[in-house]
Amino acid sequence: MKKHLLSLALIFFTALSAIAQRTITGKVTDSGGEPLIGASVLVKGSSTGTVTDLDGTYSLAVAADASVLLFSYTGYESKEVPLGTSNIVDATLEEGAEQLSEVLVTAIGIERSKKAMGYAVTNLSSSDVLQRSEADPLRAVAGKIPGVTITGAGGGPGTSTKINIRGFSSLTGNTQPLFVVDGVPFDNSVNATTGAQSGAQFSNRGFDIDPNNIESMTVLKGAAASALYGSRATNGVIVITTKSGSKGSRKGLEVTYNSSFQSEQISGIPDYQDVYAQGSNQVYNGGFIGNWGSPFPDHVDRLNATYGTNYSKVIVPGYPEGTVPHPLVSGGFAGSRFPSVFPNLMKDGKAIPVPLRPYDIIGPFFRDGGLFENSLNINGGNEKSSLNAVVSRMNNEGIVPNSHSGRTSVSVGGNAKLDNGLSVSGNVTYVNSEQKTPPSGGSVFGGNFGSTDGSIFTRLFFLPRNFDLNGINPEGIPYPFENPVTGTNVFYRALDNPLWLVKNNYFESDVNRVYGNVALNYDVTPWLALTARGGMNTYSDFQKNVKVAGGVADANGEVWTNDIKNTEIDLNYLATINTNFGENIDFRLIAGFNWNQRSYGTRYVVGDGIISRGLYNTNATVTQLSDEYNRLQRFYAAYGDMQIGYKNYLYVGFTARNDFSSTLPAANRSYFYPGVNASFVLTDAFDIANNFLGYAKLRGAWTQVG
């Protein structure tokens, strides 16, 4: 009897479950009848939802009390459809106004229609940034922004990137634009101390931005576009909105994992002559570093026949014709000073003979590099709120041995609309960036082989062509490049061996950065909104440079450290009026106040004379020299932006900003930036858009900034 009662109970509850919900199916299309793939279908007021398939169809189990389905798709107007008795619900979505008139985030986070702008603006999406696999988000968009030149300082991982927006120049050579991330200024400095670290290639701090977390990138190219940022925007502005900082909301839950790998190889090397061997005055000299000696034996007859010269093949007493004493143990090279290091290259008390011929010195020195990146993006929400989280890791091994950069980024952000007209948003990002590189910068064509820049390329590119840097001795053992007992360099008397440099000398940087913001918006009336936004951007950068004892330029060795702290706090308070006067005139006025504080501090220590091999810190040096620098700046600003539009084709805008700086004399701390711009859309005004002329606009601007 108990078994029958249990079976009856199960049947009863199953029947209740079937009655409590039903399955809705349908198709989502655009106005032309084309299916919309991946459109969101959500039960209004809940988190129950799904997305359409490749045919635009969907199937969704809904509760019995569900009353409305909400359909949405990127670039289209959302649509609410009441649920009746039918279990088939189709929806047709209309193209959104934002597609017809693109809206961009411009100065101070202001959103503006692109056709209303009286200045040049370029906008890039996340797909534009991720299309090219690059560790640096700025290099990822090189060549994609008209009028903007983006160049790297070198091919090494983590090296700096220079940006120049057309029309901006500086007597000091600083043409870097202002970076703004999620409405907060973002320091993009190259933290290099002049004279303290020669031969190193530093990163811009824009390297700390994770490309996987970029929702959009907007470049404000004119002074009129950037005037609301004041003097910092003299060279233009790059506005970045992150995925965790964007205000868009996605219905339901989406998890995206991306993984990419890019192989890197040296793109090319200079053309080298392979006609003349080491020496000078066209005479072979095993103790001379230059390539101005006798011709290689294979070229003697050709040169004499072609130019009527009287060259003869090199003959070194005691050696067969066409051979010379092994360079590593003759002349000014280390074998003549450290013969015990090269016993296998000696025979009967003298250097073994080797053919006098050119070798490929440069190519084998480099290695294949690689960029490996993984990212996880979690995005979820409903019609009133959303949450986004991005976690990523990047590793970049450079083409120069022992060169590396890496970045770990964790970002969380979200936004919510409350019932009383309030909305709140915020995001925070933590980034750890590391860089390690041998001294691959510095002067390549300096001419002084013993100079203190310590650059690998200074040493590498001017070696005699008949020297086999990457060779092996007769017993199959690679040529030694350091003394096995002391670890000192063994090479030419005025040169560090490039292989010794990449093993021992290095520059490294470890950056920890936190940035984010919180914003509160209150819609007082349909035409008046108040906004308060606060953000902070802070990082520490610990740098170390090691020059091991035993080199030519630094015989005693040197350790240099630099501890940098940088913090910026930025507060903005805005009032926005957005209304119409009749059917033809649109009016928008923004008035705001900005408070900004920047603190910067650095303490560097130079230790000379390394005491113990392998122990590389400033405390383990004979003498230390230290210095410290600190700076605190505070700025206040009042600003305004007014725009008047007529029939959606004629726009006039006025901007003004007044700054007050703590770093200027008390009697002259105020400076003013006015501006005016206009836009006239010809194709809309005269209704002349056609297949030949789809869009035409006149624009102009005048602004005082700098």
Label each residue range with its predicted role:
Residues 666-670:
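Short glycine/threonine-rich loop-to-helix capping motif typified by GTGT followed
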